[in-house]
């Protein structure tokens, strides 16, 4: 019997997935179910992609909640938060069946619907040499890879299949069969989508906004990061950043301009020491539009007309004091520890550092949170640290840095990836390259944070430098003045130069020749002022020692590295990774990346403290970094987080 494709694909697994056991993650009604795909047409294929996008709506909110509730950037309001959210926050996975957010079935719904589509779509159809189903084909492959990526990050080992599953017996066999570890999942996904990384050669569907689908380059870069293949990771993130114009060619818009210049940052003017400071907040504008988005899931603004996101009701409801999830003391403290640098006199190079007067530090957290006062309460109770990123509203910062927020409507879209992520992932990859012998790569990573992506980054793996005598075009030695103490006046000596004699590999990332990058600013400057000239934000021994709590005041009351401390290369490497992890928190807080980031960095640094201390310190108002001996943690949670097995959400057990 001929079936309508919207019904067939969008609801292929509906009526199943009751999730009483492992195989219920992927089940069909019975082995007698039959599906007729012989009459597929191009228009049906378009409708089936829309059906797949509909299923992506079902996981968008939970993707954010699972990553943030287990991380260090939120706390839960125990009087308002539903039990399911509190359990995730406490890493309590004992009642898997009752907690909808822990249920992986909807990810597998997406995956199986993608499998059905990919098995049936005809990519040979063409008109005038244009294969007009390739856009849908690549888009669906990218969605499937994205869904598997989330499962692998959350569960570590998962069932993996690429065949359409239409029978209960097959579903049971797959779900109860061997699980693939994360790296093997990524190997298979990379092989599946690598061919389609160029959005010019393989553009997303012409009928769709390309932001509906995850960019293939971002997916590849992410998976290579997890694998520790930093060369390929850097390649694809660089390609995403510099090739952004082709991704959004339909709008003739260069996304780089949305985040590379001064458009979306927080600036201060005047002297705080004289009480004349003023604040200009353009940063929060990012969250009232999707200009910088790379992947957006669209929702209805009103539940009467379709599916709505629940994030607004969780993070910033209209009810005074009703927020279930709040910004954690940990992220507020991290922001406060930053040094906001204000240029007060450019000619004389005079700068003022914010925390000296108000201890506000980086202002991005201030710019995306607000407070409520219950005017009906005799005590005028104040509720602070309410997260505004998921509420379409107007938020401004007054000169005293109090946020004024006016909520307007339900969130109608949820960004699952935005452009700034590509920059910070690129910086992460550069640091990994430095650890693999690519000299000065971490210096360029610091530039991404501090100065912006400018110039040409040329890095050599295991370079060997030698000294040679300089000769002219005739082969004669070039002479230069001999300035040694015992040299006679006017004496000359042969000139020597250091040159690169050999290297194992060379990489080059060119931003200088590309439009839009000459005015690129460091990501840290979006919330911490003029980071390019900020002496407290640098890759130098004093800043590293300050980060780990190993400085003292000398006899002239100047901060110096403690004499018993020697800053090593490993210290520099750890410091740079910590800075990127901090910047991911400051820039991308509450957007659904955090716990995965913590896991990946802890694995890369071979140090479970990277995750354990940050998570266990989320409720503490620390004024030092987690590297400092005075950093406070909740001991029971800290002990639990030291065990990597507690990082992953268990899959349901077969009954």
What is the meaning of each model-derived region?
Residues 179-185, 248-284, 353, 457-571, ...:
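Surface-exposed intrinsically disordered loops and tails
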Residues 22-69, 234, 623-655:
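Membrane-proximal, proline-rich intrinsically disordered regions
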Residues 86, 246-455, 468, 472, ...:
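Elongated scaffold/linker segments in the mid-to-C-terminal portions of large proteins
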Residues 46-47, 81-155, 179-184, 193-205, ...:
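Conserved, well-structured interaction surfaces
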Residues 152-160, 226-229, 432-435:
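Short coil/turn linking the two alpha-helices of tandem helical-hairpin repeats
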């Amino acid at each position: 019997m001929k079936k309508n494709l919207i019904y067939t694909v969008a609801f292929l697994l509906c009526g199943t997935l009751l999730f009483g056991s492992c195989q219920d993650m992927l089940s069909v009604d019975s082995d007698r179910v039959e599906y007729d795909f012989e009459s597929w047409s191009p228009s049906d294929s378009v409708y089936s992609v829309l059906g797949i996008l509909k299923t992506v709506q079902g996981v968008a909110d939970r993707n954010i909640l699972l990553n943030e509730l287990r991380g260090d950037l939120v706390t839960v309001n125990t009087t308002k938060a539903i039990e399911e959210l509190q359990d995730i926050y406490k890493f309590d996975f004992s009642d898997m069946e009752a907690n909808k957010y822990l249920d992986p079935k909807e990810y597998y719904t997406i995956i199986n619907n993608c499998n059905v589509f990919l098995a049936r779509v005809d990519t040979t159809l063409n008109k005038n040499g244009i294969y007009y189903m390739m856009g849908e084909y690549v888009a669906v492959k990218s969605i499937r890879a994205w869904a598997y990526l989330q499962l692998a990050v959350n569960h570590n080992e998962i069932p993996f299949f690429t065949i359409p599953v239409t029978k209960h017996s097959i579903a049971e066999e797959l779900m109860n069969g061997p699980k693939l570890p994360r790296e093997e999942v990524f190997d298979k996904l990379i092989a599946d989508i690598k061919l389609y990384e160029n959005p010019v050669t393989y553009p997303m569907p012409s009928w769709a906004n390309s932001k509906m689908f995850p960019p293939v380059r971002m997916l590849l870069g992410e998976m290579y990061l997890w694998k520790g293949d930093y060369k390929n990771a850097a390649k694809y993130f660089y390609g995403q950043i510099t090739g952004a114009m082709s991704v959004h060619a339909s709008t003739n818009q260069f996304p780089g301009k949305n985040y590379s210049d001064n458009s979306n940052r927080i600036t201060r003017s005047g002297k705080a020491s004289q009480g004349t400071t003023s604040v200009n907040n353009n940063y929060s504008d990012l969250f009232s539009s999707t200009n910088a988005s790379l992947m957006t899931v669209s929702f209805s603004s009103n539940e009467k007309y379709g599916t709505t996101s629940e994030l607004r009701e969780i993070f910033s409801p209209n009810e005074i004091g009703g927020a279930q999830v709040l910004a954690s003391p940990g992220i507020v403290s991290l922001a406060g520890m930053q040094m906001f640098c204000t240029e007060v006199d450019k000619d004389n190079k005079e700068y003022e550092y914010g925390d000296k007067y108000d201890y506000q530090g980086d202002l991005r957290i201030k710019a995306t949170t607000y407070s409520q006062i219950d005017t009906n309460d005799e005590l005028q109770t104040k509720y602070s640290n309410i997260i505004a990123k998921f509420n379409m509203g107007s938020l401004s910062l007054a000169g005293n840095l109090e946020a004024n927020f006016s909520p307007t409507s339900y969130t109608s879209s949820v960004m699952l990836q935005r452009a700034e992520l590509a920059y910070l992932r690129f910086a992460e990859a550069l640091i990994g390259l430095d650890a693999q012998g690519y000299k000065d790569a971490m210096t360029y990573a610091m530039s991404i944070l501090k100065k912006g992506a400018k110039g040409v980054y040329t890095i050599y793996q295991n370079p060997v430098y030698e000294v040679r005598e300089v000769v002219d075009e005739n082969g004669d030695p070039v002479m230069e003045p001999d300035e040694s103490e015992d040299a006679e006046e006017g004496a000359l000596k042969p000139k020597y130069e250091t040159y690169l004699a050999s290297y194992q590999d060379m990489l080059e990332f060119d931003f200088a020749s590309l439009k839009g990058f000459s005015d690129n600013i460091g990501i840290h400057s979006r919330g911490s002022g003029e980071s390019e000239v900020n002496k407290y934000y640098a890759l130098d021994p004093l800043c590293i020692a300050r980060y780990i709590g190993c400085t003292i005041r000398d006899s002239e009351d100047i901060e110096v590295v403690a004499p018993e401390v020697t800053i090593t290369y490993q210290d520099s490497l750890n410091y740079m990774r910590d800075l990127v992890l901090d910047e991911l928190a400051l820039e991308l807080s509450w957007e659904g990346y955090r716990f995965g980031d913590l896991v990946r960095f802890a694995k890369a640094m071979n140090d479970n403290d990277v995750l354990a201390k940050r998570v266990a310190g989320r409720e503490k108002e620390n004024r030092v970094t987690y590297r400092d001996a005075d950093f406070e943690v909740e001991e029971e949670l800290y002990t639990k987080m030291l065990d990597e097995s507690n990082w992953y959400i268990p899959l349901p057990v077969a009954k």
